[in-house]
From Swiss-Prot:
Its cofactor is Fe cation. Its EC number is 1.15.1.1. Coiled coil: none annotated. The lineage of its organism: Bacteria, Pseudomonadati, Pseudomonadota, Gammaproteobacteria, Pseudomonadales. The gene is sodB. This is Superoxide dismutase [Fe]. Keywords: Iron, Metal-binding, Oxidoreductase. Belongs to the iron/manganese superoxide dismutase family. Fe cation binds at residues 27, 74, 157, 161. It is an enzyme of class 1 (oxidoreductase). Homodimer.
């Protein structure tokens, strides 16, 4: 069965002024879609045929991994954003962030540093470790926390195609704008154990 490009969970212009309609048209409709097309061209006739996207990400390498992980990462990223996002988390997630980082502001500062400081194209992540603790991670290229057994809670895409139309080379400005869109309800669902399937 072929993989399909999931629709955005909001309209292309819904994240303005922080992320433009043009960026989403390129980022989702072209870049994300290209990974889907590539994956569908690579999988037939391999051991990965018939496997879920998550299974492929956890067990593949090379071109199949790169495209599968990028499909998964992007679908997860779109869900981390919302036109009604921003603000701060509440409840158990907020408590866990405070316990791990000292305060929400300190977490925000550290996550921003992790994302901005990712060398080249990659992703900044908040993850839940197997012992339930929270940690930050930076992955290069198509890197995905699923491969290390961590549970992704939040990601910021810092590939240049995520921000270049709107912010050019100013990655810090893009990450600053990202905070206005974070979908804390989605992040909380992941923290509480809801399994995300891309």
């Amino acid at each position: 069965m072929a993989f399909e490009l999931p629709p955005l969970p909001y309209a292309h212009d819904a994240l303005q002024p922080h992320i433009s309609k043009e960026t989403l048209e390129y980022h989702h409709d072209k870049h994300h879609n290209t990974y889907v097309v590539n994956l569908n061209n690579l999988v037939p006739g391999t051991e990965f045929e018939g496997k879920t996207l998550e299974e492929i990400v956890k067990s593949s390498s090379g071109g199949i991994f790169n495209n599968a992980a990028q499909v998964w990462n992007h679908t997860f990223y779109w869900n981390c954003l919302s036109p009604n996002g921003g603000g701060q988390p509440t409840g158990a997630l907020a408590d866990a962030i405070n316990a791990a980082f000292g305060s929400f502001d300190k977490f925000k500062e550290e996550f921003t540093k992790t994302s901005v400081g990712t060398f080249g194209s990659g992703w900044g992540w908040l993850v839940k470790k197997a012992d339930g603790s929270l940690a930050l991670a930076s992955t290069i290229g198509a890197g995905c926390p699923l491969t290390s057994g961590d549970t992704p809670l939040l990601t910021c895409d810092v590939w240049e195609h995520a921000y270049y139309i709107d912010y050019r080379n100013l990655r810090p400005k893009y990450v600053e704008a990202f905070w206005n869109l974070v979908n804390w309800a989605f992040v909380a669902e992941q923290f509480e154990g809801k399994t995300f399937k891309a």
